Amino acid sequence: VDRPFKEVEANEGYRLSIDLAEQTLTTPGGETFTFDITEHRKHCLLNGLDEIGLTLQHADKIKAFEEKRRQSQPWLFNG
């Protein structure tokens, strides 16, 4: 994948097409390269999530856990 990026640096206006879902990069000449990315990172990028957004997807479970803990260990929450 180094060669296409060298082309980008050397040629103003040079464009690459990146298909994150298929993990491919295509040059203007039609040459295709594959690249690796972790499933976690891919999921976040495809869904526009950062670590906070990813955590907020589980807000209901987090609230349920907190409430259960508040009931089972109320001394932690006094004050």
Curated annotation (Swiss-Prot):
One of its GO terms (molecular function) is 3-isopropylmalate dehydratase activity. One of its GO terms (biological process) is L-leucine biosynthetic process. Gene3D superfamilies: Aconitase, domain 4 (3.20.19.10). Its EC number is 4.2.1.33. It comes from the Bacteria. It catalyses: (2R,3S)-3-isopropylmalate = (2S)-2-isopropylmalate. Pathway: Amino-acid biosynthesis; L-leucine biosynthesis; L-leucine from 3-methyl-2-oxobutanoate: step 2/4. Keywords: Amino-acid biosynthesis, Branched-chain amino acid biosynthesis, Leucine biosynthesis, Lyase. Heterodimer of LeuC and LeuD. Belongs to the LeuD family. LeuD type 1 subfamily. Catalyzes the isomerization between 2-isopropylmalate and 3-isopropylmalate, via the formation of 2-isopropylmaleate. This is 3-isopropylmalate dehydratase small subunit. It comes from Neisseria gonorrhoeae. The lineage of its organism: Bacteria, Pseudomonadati, Pseudomonadota, Betaproteobacteria, Neisseriales.
